[in-house]
Amino acid sequence: MSPRSRSAPSAPPDSPTTAPTAAPGAPPGNRAAVPGPDGPDGAPPDRAPRRRPPSPGPGRRRVLVLAGSAGAAAALGPATGASPAAAPASGTRPQRRVPGGRAAVDAPHTGTTLTGVAAPSGDGPFRRLVTGPGWARVVRTELARAGARRAARAEPLASFVQFTDLHLVDVQHPLRYEYLRAQTASAWRPQESLSVAGAVSLVERVNALAGGPATGASLSCVVTTGDNTDNNSRAELEWFTTVLSGGRITPDTGDPRIHEGVQDCGLPDFWQPDSDLRDRDKAVGFPRLRGFLRAAGRQVAGPGLKLPWYATVGNHDALPGGCFAAADARGFFADFATGDRKLMRLPEEQGARLWRAVERGRDPGGRLFTELLRAERRHMRKVTPDPARAPVTPRDYIRALARPQALGPGPAGHGYTEENAVEGTLYYAFRIAPDVMGYSLDTTRRDGHYTGRVGAAQLSWLRRQLAAHRDRYALVFSHHTSTTTPEGGTELLALLRDTPHALAWINGHSHRNRISPHGTFWEVSTASHTDFPQLARTLELVDNRDGTLSLFTTLIESAAPHRTDFTDLSQTGLASLYRELAFNAPGARHGLAGAEGDRNTELLLRKP
């Protein structure tokens, strides 16, 4: 039976509807362009789809356009349009009635990239950011036509937010490989020490949204798609849960009186913000900022999300460095992570050899990395040991999300259940809206490597879930993309193509916006919140009541102002600086915002 049209609920979504069974040897993956980066057949779903009375007619709870046809076009996109090309949406914002009886005056475009986006100004190697023109909405019709009257008929089904690749990072962690900067710009980023302040500002932006930017419908939840943390570290995991659930965070480990990372090591290879040293970053315009490191490690106050949130695991959450085999509570990597030595510099030739091995998958277990660290011990800086830097196992990860302190707006476990913890699986199903199911997958490779994998057992579990909930639309979430999942990715694409009610595969990992049609569904990949342009995405599913559906995607930035002031080291000032440093990072990849058709879109689908 095809999914039925219903309006999105104003109440929070349910807890997971099913808990997967064992996932032996799940595997792990990457941190977008950096190193890094299933369980056995699960039990049947713990409950069958609930049967509800049929929808009482086509006019039921449909969106009512109160501001005229121009406003409708602005919110729902042009009535016609070919593939990624399309006329921009009008700036007029409509008033509309949304599920739950609450009228949304003006579809909430404010705070989205529809109205403005950070853009560089001026000349010189270090460019300041200002507010540039917004990105127009593009109507994409590769999978279905765009009916001329769809805006007037449209009925919202679901509205939620995607966070991906936050990379909350302990910049003093001993296992980090900043010394590979010459091989890959993602080994070290000058903005990294501000990741927590930046993520808190993103939460503030979501909390300020009045509803979905396209429909005005109430947002039901936030779903992360992995690389929530950077170093598979207990401290970073605590920061992540506190950022999303609310509380005070001190983004610092080791000795609170001193900074023991590469930004205070006296080497010209890295930006030394508090020093007069003429390092390679100051040579291209990076400022000298007295008090920067002290401010970066200062306590941050986070309001936490007002919405329920669900987590998906990425390779940096699961693997040391995002690319080496999962660490146990004991062993070399665990001991080194919590130990008193940190390597700051490596001859370029040695670094190149190690990086080639990582890229080519020759060192998934980290043998070469281990040998290197042992051989270079006498060249390392002595640092303050800290048990909070210990690696996190899958069970640690699940139980950390289930702690009372991590609850926030819920649900308990943020998708994961005690059964997941017992079985060691990191995939689950959850309800986004009455007629929309979400499926969070684990695409990491626990035996090492930053690329993705979907094992046979997990595919079998997903196939059963999709069959059990065939009367609801399906949205699949994972960290890795179809092009970065060499094992099981093709099979997953085939499964989704063969499932009429599967509408989208939503992911991250590549740190780049990209939206691709796959015959019957869309793949939506979203840029990270660590590399510029530092984005998240809202997604809104609409029934056009003409035999088609629309999936609206709208990019958002953090609430931090685009303009920065180098003298402002407040929490908000640091969040602004986080974005500007990312734009100017030497060697950073440009073009991560993607093309117009990868940003703010209306994606048409045939209704199954």
Model-derived regions: residue spans:
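N-terminal secretory signal peptides
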Residues: M1-P58
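Metal-dependent phosphoesterase/phosphodiesterase active-site architecture
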Residues: S2-R4, P88-A214, S220-C221, D264-L293, ...
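N-terminal export signals
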Residues: R52-P53, R62-A82
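Active-site-adjacent structural elements in enzyme catalytic domains
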Residues: P156, T224-G247, P251-G254, R298, ...
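Active-site glycine-centered loops adjacent to acidic/histidine catalytic or metal-binding residues
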Residues: D165, G226-D227, G314-N315, H479, ...
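Sec-exported extracytoplasmic/periplasmic mature domains
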Residues: N207-G211, T241-I249, A467, R497
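Metal-dependent catalytic neighborhoods of phosphoester/phosphodiester hydrolases
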Residues: T225-S245, P320-G331, T485-E487, R514-G519
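Active-site-proximal segments of metal-dependent phosphoesterases and phosphodiesterases across multiple
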Residues: R445-N507
